[in-house]
Structure formats: C-alpha cells, structure tokens
C-alpha cells in the first residue's frame, strides 16, 4: 500500500509571519493628495446643457464684453449665449479647432483678406497672385514680391508673442481636451507653445497641431527635400546686386553633393532650389494625403466641440474639413462655434449646416468667458 503525502495546512515554522496589527494599506495611496483630485474630478464633471440657441444664431462678443451700452434686458438676453460659449470652453472634453490668420492679429501680424490685410497692400495685381505657385515661380517680379512678403512675415513673427487665444488653446491641449488644432496660419505662433507643437515634416505620432499650409519657419529644397530653418539672408528681395542672395536660392546640400560627385568623376545630377515651406495655390500639397488620413481618424472620435476661428473659409479643402467635423459634432450633440470679426457669407453657413452660434468680434475677448 502506497503512503500518501499530504501537504500541511499551515505554513512551516520557517515562514515569516506578519503581525495581525500591521498596516496593510497601499503605500502609494496618499489621502491628502487624493482628496483634491476627487474634488477636481467632481468640478470638471460635464453638467447637463440647459440652453442651446437656434442654428446660425449671432452673438456680438465685443458688445457683450463692453456692456456699457447694453440695457438690462439686452444684457440678460445675451447672458444665455455667453453661458453657452462658456459651457463649450469649460466642459468640452474632445475639441477640434480650425484656425485662420485672425487669431494672430492681436500679436501684430496682419490677416490676409480684411480691409487692412496683406492682400490689400499688394500693388499691381491681386493678393491671391502672391500665393499662386504658377505666378510666383513663373515671373521674376512676382518672385521678388513673394520673397519680400515671406521675409517680412518671418521677421515679424519672430518678434511677436502668442496671443491670449493661443494660450487658451495651449491650456486645452495641456489638459487633454484638445483633440486637434488644424491651423491655416504660417506664422508659427501656435507651435511655439509647448502643448501645441508639431512635427516638420508631418509624421507619427500625430501632433496636437496640424499645419494645413506649412510654416514660414522652415525652407525646403525642391530636389533633395532637405528641410532647414528659414534663412531670410538667402532670399533676394530687391533689384540691387548682391552676390550672397538669389531670387530662388540654390540648395547648399545639393551643391555639396555635386562637388563630391565631381571629385569622384561622377555625372552631375543637378542642384535643387530652396523655397519657403509654405503651400501655395495650384500646387500639389506634399502632405495632403496624410492630413486627410488624420482628419478621417479624428472624425471617428467622439468630438463634442468644433471651434472655427479667424477664417473666412475661402479655401474649399478647409471648408470641407469644417463641414465634416460640424456634421460629426452635431450628431454627437456637441457644440459648433464660428468666431470671426465679420459675418460669414450665407453660402458658407449653408455648407456647414450645423453652426450653433456665430460669435462676432475679437476672438481674444472669448478668453474672458472661461
């Protein structure tokens, strides 16, 4: 008969026993830190939206901020719309912002299409011609004007600081509430901020900010595609002779490769030309497919707020992105705000379909509603 071995129910005497009175609480649990976190969680909990204006309602932001000329009844009526904006800014959890040049005007950088914008200062042609690829690189005089504009914008933006609106977006991104900023701006004020940084060239992981039209902060070779910080000293801006500058400067990296190939007895492959890394009309967007992929992925998220700000949406591709996001946000019972200094054209609002509130005035004032 085989003897069965039974393991002892109690551990052997050599096992270390802990006293029953020992405190077994999680050592990482710090009650004094936990309580403020719980309070913050309760405070940030999204309350129920009690008021929604009719679609395409208009709110005069400047008049509301400077309410000295408003009657008591007018102020009371506008308080509801102001509360609606405040709700969107304070409680939205997954926001998409599509911005234009209007958000940088307060920093000292002019916009493009207003009565005092960049396009209005162009002599001998339309302002749009300065951003047309065929005109800029098909006519020497237009190339000079384009260089003047790019160098001027670069130096101006270098001496400007992000605005209160930029700072507000940076805070949204810091708090994890900004899904994406799609910016049409080339001044780079937004990407100076730590939580609105981007990748140049655009690459994964997808950054907080997607630059739809490039940036004046960089230049690129059309041949080797080498990207460098923009150097204004390379670009000729007038008719005066200067051996250090060219209207369309040659790429130093390509020239170096050519020198090496020549010394090695290899045939020439040509030297590329440098240009500001700004996307122009009538050229293929080098990152267009990737931006479309990012937008399509963002559309799959549960976006609860779309803010269109500082843009007239004249560019069809940008208007189409806004239209798709507006439909998605509306389906999610979110909020769509359109902030601009002037009333958007009816055809733009009809295309977007689901704008809850058109906020007229200086977008910097909206930060007072936080």
UniProtKB/Swiss-Prot annotation:
**Cofactor binding mode and count:** Binds 1 zinc ion per subunit.
Report one GO cellular component: mating-type region heterochromatin
- Specify where the region named Disordered lies, as residue ranges: 1-27
Q: Where does NAD(+) bind?
A: 100-119, 184-187, 310-312, 340-342, 363
- What UniProt keywords apply to this chain's record, in alphabetical order? Metal-binding, NAD, Nucleus, Repressor, Transcription, Transcription regulation, Transferase, Zinc
Q: What class of enzyme is it?
A: transferase
Where do the catalytic residues lie?
213
Mark out the compositionally biased spans (Basic and acidic residues). 15-27
Gene3D superfamilies, alphabetically?
SIR2/SIRT2 'Small Domain, TPP-binding domain
Per the record, the domain of life is Eukaryota
Q: Where is the Deacetylase sirtuin-type domain?
A: 75-370
Q: Which GO terms describe its molecular function?
A: histone deacetylase activity, NAD-dependent; metal ion binding; NAD+ binding
List residues binding Zn(2+).
221, 224, 251, 254
Cofactor requirements of the protein: Zn(2+)
Which compartment or compartments is the protein found in?
A: Nucleus
Instruction: Report which reactions are catalysed by this protein.
Output: N(6)-acetyl-L-lysyl-[protein] + NAD(+) + H2O = 2''-O-acetyl-ADP-D-ribose + nicotinamide + L-lysyl-[protein]
Q: Which family does it belong to?
A: Belongs to the sirtuin family. Class I subfamily.
Give the protein's function: NAD-dependent histone deacetylase, which contributes together with HST3 to histone H3 'Lys-56' deacetylation, regulation of telomeric silencing, proper cell cycle progression, DNA damage control, DNA recombination, and genomic maintenance.
Recite the other comments: Present with 377 molecules/cell in log phase SD medium.
- Its recorded name reads NAD-dependent histone deacetylase HST4
Q: Could you tell me which species this protein originates from?
A: Saccharomyces cerevisiae (strain ATCC 204508 / S288c)
Gene name? HST4
């Amino acid at each position: 008969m085989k003897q069965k071995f039974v393991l002892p129910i109690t551990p052997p005497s050599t096992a270390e026993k802990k006293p029953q009175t020992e405190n077994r609480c999680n050592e990482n649990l710090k009650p004094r830190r936990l309580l403020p976190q719980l309070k913050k969680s309760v405070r940030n909990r999204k309350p129920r939206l009690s008021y929604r204006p009719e679609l395409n309602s208009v709110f005069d932001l400047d008049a509301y901020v400077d309410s000295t000329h408003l009657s008591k009844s007018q102020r009371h009526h506008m308080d509801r719309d102001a509360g609606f904006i405040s709700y969107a800014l304070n409680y939205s959890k997954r926001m998409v912002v599509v911005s234009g040049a209007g958000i940088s005007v307060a920093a000292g950088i002019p916009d493009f299409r207003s009565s005092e914008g960049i396009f209005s200062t162009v002599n001998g042609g339309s302002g749009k011609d300065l951003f047309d690829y065929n005109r800029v690189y098909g006519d020497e005089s237009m190339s000079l004007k384009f260089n003047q504009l790019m160098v001027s914008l670069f130096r101006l933006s270098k001496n400007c600081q992000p605005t209160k609106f930029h700072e507000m977006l940076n805070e949204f991104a810091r708090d994890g509430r900004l899904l994406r900023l799609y910016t049409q701006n080339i001044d780079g004020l937004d990407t100076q901020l730590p939580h609105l940084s981007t990748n140049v060239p655009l690459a994964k992981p997808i950054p907080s900010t997607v630059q739809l039209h490039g940036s004046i902060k960089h230049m690129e070779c059309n041949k080797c595609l080498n990207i460098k910080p923009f150097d204004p000293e390379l670009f000729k801006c007038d008719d005066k002779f200067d051996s250090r500058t060219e209207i369309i400067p040659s790429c130093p990296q390509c020239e170096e490769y050519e020198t090496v190939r020549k010394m090695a007895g290899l045939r020439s492959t040509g030297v590329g030309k440098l240009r500001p890394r700004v996307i122009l009309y009538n050229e293929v967007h080098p990152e267009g497919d990737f931006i479309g992929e990012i937008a399509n992925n963002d559309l799959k998220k549960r976006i609860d707020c779309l803010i269109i700000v500082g843009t007239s949406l004249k560019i069809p591709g940008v208007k189409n992105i806004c239209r798709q996001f507006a439909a998605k946000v509306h389906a999610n019972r979110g909020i769509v705000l359109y902030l601009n200094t002037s009333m958007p054209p009816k055809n733009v609002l009809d295309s977007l379909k689901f704008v809850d509130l058109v906020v007229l005035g200086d977008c910097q004032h909206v930060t007072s509603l936080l």
